[in-house]
Each structure stands twice: as C-alpha cells, then as structure tokens.
Amino acid sequence: MQLRITSRKKLTALLCALGLISIVAIYPRQTVNFFYSTAVQITDYIHFYGYRPVKSFAIHIPASYTIHGIDVSRWQERIDWQRVAKMRDNGIRLQFAFIKATEGEKLVDPYFSRNWQLSRENGLLRGAYHYFSPSVAAPVQARLFLQTVDFSQGDFPAVLDVEERGKLSAKELRKRVSQWLKMVEKSTGKKPVIYSGAVFYHTNLAGYFNEYPWWVAHYYQRRPDNDGMAWRFWQHSDRGQVDGINGSVDFNVFNGTEEELQAFVDGIKETP
C-alpha cells in the first residue's frame, strides 16, 4: 500500500528539514556531538547487550558472571600486584591471574618469577601457562614448562595456550598437543587447561580433548561460541585497565560459583 503525500504533509516535511538545517548551521559542533553520542550509545547497546560498564576497568564486563581475573605476560612489564589486588569497582574485584611462564623450546618470560610470587602473596589465585610452538617437539616444550614452574597447593592447573598450527595438519597438531598434556598431567597430577581462540578451536580442536577444561577467547559476545565445549574460563576483552598495570590487559571470567572455583583449584571432580 502506498501512502498519499498531500501538500500539507509536503509543507510540514519541508519546514522540518529547514529547521534541522538551521540548527546544524547555528550549532554545528553540538549537533555533530549529539548524533555521534547517540550513535555510540546505540552501538554500545547492540554490542554490549548482556554486559555492564565498569568505569574503573574501562571496559564492559559480562553481567551474569561474578568471578573475574586477568592474564599477563612480559608485555605488561613490571606489575604492582598490591594495587591490582586492592582494586574494586561496583562490587567487582580481581580474584585470579594467569601468568605466562614459557614458550616453545627455550623462552622463559622474564617477568614470570616475579609475577608468580607476588600474585600469590597478594591473595590472587594464580595459574601458569605455556605458549605452544607447533614447530618444536612437545616433550621439549613440556620439560621447559615443568622445569620453570614450581606449583603449590591452591594453584590452578597448568595451562597450554594453543593458537597456531604452523605447517602442521590439524591432526598432527592435536597429536603434539596431546603429548604435552599427558606429560604435564602425569607430572602435576592435574589435567591441564587448554586455551584457544574460538575460531582456531572450531577449525582445529573442536570435538577433541573434551576431558580437559577449556579457556576460550571470544570478544564482544554475550557468551563464547563454544560448539559444545565445556569451558571454564572465558577471555572476553583485551582492553581492560587495572591499577598497577601499564597499558591494556586481558580480562576473563570463571564459569561457575565460588564453591565450584574452589573445587576446581582443589582438583575435585563435580558430581554430574
């Protein structure tokens, strides 16, 4: 059905247009700012539906999770862990930190020992991760990690960060990942956590390693696209700001309650 446009309607539309043009001409900057602000608010609502803004941390945080943490490496340089642990905003505090320990065959993060010690001393739960290099034999990488990290009771299980395949097929990558996981589990007595991005997971790892806990990176989503993955941790942003840390830092949530977090740390299997 087509609407008939009368002369009166045409006149009204013309007057409205002239009025808008006059406002823009008289207040150009204010008009642009108004429309920009409105557009930003609409965009924020679309992108962050299910999130809530937390001003001090400079990001939106998923609203339905209560346990928050960060992950750090040499890129954050020297961290003031006392300030990190004291930070609070709107009932949100940081309860855990994943810390890069090693990478590939030889690389040990230069800040690992300091971060590992001070995060625990300031009351945060801590976990150590190894960045997996597909070009290096898995046993070599596992030994480097185990020689570097001194686990204590109350620490998270070891974490394997798998983000690249290199020249390997997906099948060969999974074989090497499995070798690392089994070696580290045998040594530590706990099943390691596997970290990966959502896209890489779907392409290379989906349907495998279901017996292991997962930590998935997927930004600006209401929930991570997990394709049936039983994820424990979700890295939802890489732009957080935290007292005591220079620059941006990754933010994560734990998928569970305080009791489930403690059971996870203790290595207690939940009753189905």
Swiss-Prot record:
Keyword Hydrolase: yes
GO biological process assignments: carbohydrate catabolic process; cell wall macromolecule catabolic process; peptidoglycan catabolic process
Domain of life: Bacteria
Keyword set, alphabetical order: Glycosidase, Hydrolase
Active site: E163
GO molecular function: lysozyme activity
Entry keyword annotation includes Hydrolase: yes
Pfam families, alphabetized: Glyco_hydro_25
Matching SUPFAM superfamilies: (Trans)glycosidases
Family to which the UniProt record says this protein belongs: Belongs to the glycosyl hydrolase 25 family.
Name of the protein: Uncharacterized protein YegX
Species this protein is from: Escherichia coli O157:H7
Gene: yegX
